[in-house]
Amino acid sequence: MRILRTPDTCFDGLKDYPFEPNYTQITTDDGSALRIHHLDEGARDGDLVLCLHGQPVWSYLYRKMVPYLTQSGLRVIAPDLPGYGKSDKPAAREDYSYERQVEWMGQWLEENDFNNITVFGQDWGGLIGLRLVANHPDRFARVVISNTGLPYNPTTSEQLLKEIQQFRTDAPTPSLMAMQKAISGMPSGDPALKFAYWQKFCWESEQLPVGMMMQMMMERPSTPVMAVNFLMNQLGLFNYSPCRSDVAKAYDAPFPDASYKMGPRAMPSHVPTTSASA
């Protein structure tokens, strides 16, 4: 397995992220060494809260929660999933699967011997975290999940499944705007069809604009700011946009070039919405 490691300098000067890094080495099924990063903040004898992030973010997501939790006497552990943040990044699409993330994080959990855990899982962190609870029930005391779940409906018609599979196979890559429109409409209609826009956009966008997307979703910038960022991104110059925020910079930090983005590109396709999900 070819594994990439983001240089530490990429994370220099991140706003509101003063935390010391901690690293654990695990072994993949082909014998490769894989290093997983995590935050470990607060009193060592405090009740342990495990914060698991989703796609395409990393432990930076929890930067504002950590101080509140530690001030309450809790110990906070926030890892970066393999492929994200300061953790190592397997370089091939086939390196990523739901099962492998569960296996890797299970090894990480055992190596650190964490116990009496309250797990908070968001997005993929919920999917992976719930499997960790099932596989290691004696290590967990409480479960809190948010914004997570499989967009799979067993009553979806065969015709709709064929439409989704045909869309993913034959349709042109959706634009960022088309993808966002589809995702924002997920509460109505069939979520699997709309989620397919996210799956296809992520996989087929070699230069997946992680930072720009996070700035849009988390900060809701004004129309002029969005227009400038869209233009700069189209020109391949988003890193130089005068409207690029600290949040965008932080979520771009793990990915110095496109080769590091295989995790966030590949993982949405592993959500089982159709038989083509693999």
Task: List the model feature ranges, each with a label.
Residues 1-21, 36-41, 48, 61, ...:
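Flexible "cap/lid" subdomain of the alpha/beta-hydrolase fold that forms the substrate-access gate
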Residues 28-34:
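Short, solvent-exposed loop/turn segments that connect beta-strands within catalytic domains
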Residues 46-53:
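Short beta-strand element of the alpha/beta-hydrolase
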Residues 53-56, 255:
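Conserved residues at beta->alpha junctions
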Residues 55-66:
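The serine-hydrolase catalytic nucleophile loop
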Residues 68-70:
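Short hydrophobic signal-anchor/transmembrane segments that target glycosyltransferases
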